[in-house]
């Protein structure tokens, strides 16, 4: 039976796990690490790098290295947060039909396509590790992701060739991993502060039930923002000292980004760190170096307001849950940014208890996703997961008001209907504008899309009865329908919003991804062929030096000619796999006499111990070893 891959698709890093033998376990990538940087890079030769290889060349290739793409997933370009991301990120964010996309050398990629490349790497590495094909996945998203962001995540999975069985909230996944084996009922807070997003969710676990009581968060608050505070401080300090503004130097900013991230990590255990960036820039007087000491106290002063913001959100969620702090049994920390001492201190002060650090903050979400996959498949029995919608959903009504149909905190899946009518006499059609958010006015909420129900018979305003139904599935993805009760006419859409992709676009992107997969396979085969050819050339040269005198001059000349042909084809960067293989075959054919001479030489060297070898063979001691050497 095929395994379901549990995937934590993170802003900074991603992680994967499977459920096997009654437990979920994290799968390492092909580099042997349990987490993979969520970074995709395009080289000037058209090669696509994902993970650590992509991250390694962020500084030298900033315009073609895409990271933190989760921050613009399912987002419209005119949104304030998108404009903020544009200023911060070194690559080119462009408008694609109103939605955010990335331009690399004139080719436009949606955030879904970039994320799909990360998912494809995880899928391929898992397949190599497990020795079987993976076709199904459960992918996690921040609890505070809106409908457009959830749908975009599911589309990324489809493009990567995965059947996404479920989109699950990250804190809920963490609670599932933490609380599955707890028999006693516990009320737990999952405080999830990752690279780009923050969620706090309050759940009740026990006796195989995980029920979300309340959730809240900020989809634009995380470790990236802490890095940015350090970067801004370094830029200001450097400008004071030299008069040079590094903000316009993309390569310098990438070096600052890397240094800030490292400094942040070091300050989790050290009280002080030095940021040393030689040759950061230059002016007429010569090269400039950036050397600054950053203390933990200074770092904490830079990020304190951001950490306080998470506590304010936690307080609001606690109120929504109807619980007091005393009723909370455990506070579980999730996400790499919870390693920051100030974060742990503020959480402890607010909840009045030591946070639970028993789970690995980088891996627990993927583990929970794998458990959810096993629940869906029936490998884990009798587990009930009751999640909620993080934001209210409704439609725009007369006067630009947001009328809520499903309130935030409603357990999903859920289906609710409400009757509306026309605003004018003889109105032939109604436009249903679908919204998500908590504000009173439509314009202040997130627009998820709109559609029109036509063919309403002429009637005075207020007479027609239009039934609007909101249906949220277990993924938190919304379908909206409008039905004229008099005629039975119905219009239904799965809300994609203007940032969503059409089915045709998704299929095209799947085909593109497959085509690139084939290109990558061919590129890998070419590299392997080159390596084998290089090894053959080296071995042949070595053999010629050692036993070249044992063959005729004519044979030696043929071998040297074939060897030179192989060396020349290896020098040609544009040489194809077939061209290299032809030269390898030619050299192999003419050098069999040389191979025989080498074999005889080796046999001669071992001849002195032949008698002992015979004795060992009689006793059966080295029979297998000798056979292996001959092969």
Swiss-Prot record:
Residues 622-631 have a biased composition (Acidic residues). Keywords: ATP-binding, Chaperone, Nucleotide-binding, Phosphoprotein, Stress response. Residues 598-631 are annotated as: Disordered. The modification Phosphothreonine is found at residue 197. Disulfide bonds: none annotated. One of its GO terms (molecular function) is unfolded protein binding. Induction: By stress conditions e.g. heat shock. InterPro entries: ATPase_NBD, Chaperone_DnaK, Heat_shock_70_CS, HSP70_C_sf, HSP70_peptide-bd_sf, Hsp_70_fam. SUPFAM superfamilies: Actin-like ATPase domain, Heat shock protein 70kD (HSP70), C-terminal subdomain, Heat shock protein 70kD (HSP70), peptide-binding domain. It comes from the Bacteria. Pfam families: HSP70. This is Chaperone protein DnaK.
